[in-house]
Amino acid sequence: MKQVQVHPPNPHWPHAFEAEAAQVSRILGDNVVHIHHIGSTAIPNIYAKPVIDMLAEVSNIDRVDACNAAMAALGYTALGEYGLPGRRYFRKDNAEGVRTHHVHIFLAGSPEVIRHLAFRDFMRANPDCAQQYSDLKRALAAQYPNDIDSYMDGKDEFVKAMEKRAMEEQALS
């Protein structure tokens, strides 16, 4: 089983995102509309698994498949849709086999893009909710140190509730 470790907030995470996003953007070329930093490392002052999550919006999702070899040269494994229709998913491990990056690619403006960005922006704008999320992640990592599936399942209800609030707030603005 994969070990679950959450780390204290790291001021390097945004810089790590910027550096990697620049390389991914070069690979995607003129197909890329925008690359966003998502996931817990994109939310200030919370504990996170030290994995940089990126969400790339593209103008043509089918053109992404032609980039698989270039992404592999950058160290990524292409996993196709990986359970989410319309997505292209890549992950990257370091030399020790530890996960360092995820790249989720969707058609620009898709519902998945809107959902991910709404959650991130809601958590950034609501530090109390972000702190609750951080505390939950730490508790789950302590409870399930060797069970990533139980850790993820434990976050699910909270994340869905926050996504719902985020989408409701977005609809009102």
Please place each PLM-identified region on the residue numbering.
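Histidine-centered active-site/metal-ligand motif
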Residues: 36-37, 101-104, 116, 151
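Active-site nucleotide-donor binding segment shared across nucleotidyl transfer reactions
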Residues: 23-65
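Short, flexible turn/loop "capping" segments at secondary-structure junctions
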Residues: 1, 45-49, 114
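Helical scaffold of the NTase/Pol beta-like nucleotidyltransferase catalytic core
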Residues: 1-36, 160
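Catalytic cores of NTP-dependent nucleotidyl/adenyl transfer enzymes across multiple folds
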Residues: 109-173
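Short histidine-centered catalytic/ligand-binding loop motif
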Residues: 5-11, 56, 119-123
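Short amphipathic alpha-helices in soluble, non-transmembrane regions
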Residues: 66-74
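Conserved catalytic core of two-metal-ion nucleotidyltransferases
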Residues: 76-111
